[in-house]
Amino acid sequence: MTDTGIFYGTGAAEGVPSPFCDCPMCNYAREHGGKDVRKRSCFRLGRNIMIDMGPDIFTQALQYGSMCDIEHVLITHTHDDHFNFTALGLMSMATHLRTTPVHFYLSEEGYRFIELLRDSEIAFGGTLRGMEKKGIYAFHKLKYFETYSIGEYEVTPIRGNHGGNMAKERSANYVLKAKDGTKMLYGMDTGLYEEETLDFMKNQNLDIWISECTFGNLKLQEEWNTHLCCLLYTSPSPRD
């Protein structure tokens, strides 16, 4: 598993450099480019699985190549920087349309967002249902802590501590188990996990843990409990 993952984007919602920010970090990224530029969050696992599909999908495809092999997209939550539904329209604009759909997976509350889009003129003039019927893509509802067979992996969504576009939505972080037994947690977006999730994770015996540090070196504050900071991993008391 370690040699099949590619980070297409590791930035927060505003990316780096942020379009409307002239802080030293953003200005440095504009000047130097390269690794200091961060596109919005997206991770590709192997040939056909992707985690999140945000607003930088066009640029990411330019940099990393065709996405025609993608068959499964695990959505962590419905914020635009992780699930940019307008990207769905790109799949219907291909000269050679797919013969099998791209499968999108969301939490139960995240799936409600899809149900709203199906009946909304905002989503391609109300044609989302029609594109589903044509087999361009399909949407699936996942329950937290239940395991599903997706592609070549066993996938278990766990409850994150981060909202989405729906009022009661909480992010889905994903535990993925490969055929060789290697187990990985893709843990973003989230704040500090709640007890239910911590209890589930106690016996998972992870080999790889991918997490976030949105707040960098800032001290973790209670009101920020939707993201994490670097001090969480380096200090026994990240709020001190």
What does each model-identified segment do?
Residues M1-Y64, F139-T197:
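Core dinuclear metal-dependent hydrolase active-site scaffold
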Residues N48, M53-Y105, L206-W209:
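Active-site metal-binding motif and surrounding structural segment of the metallo-beta-lactamase
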Residues P55, D80, G191-L192, F215, ...:
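Short, glycine/acidic-enriched loop or turn micro-motifs at the edges of active sites
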Residues C68, T100, G135, Y153, ...:
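Structured loop/turn residues at beta-strand edges in well-structured enzyme cores
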Residues R98-P101, E108-A138:
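Active-site neighborhood of divalent metal-dependent phosphoester bond hydrolases
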Residues L176-L228:
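Metallo-beta-lactamase
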Residues Y233-D240:
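Conserved small/polar residues in nucleotide/adenosyl-binding loops
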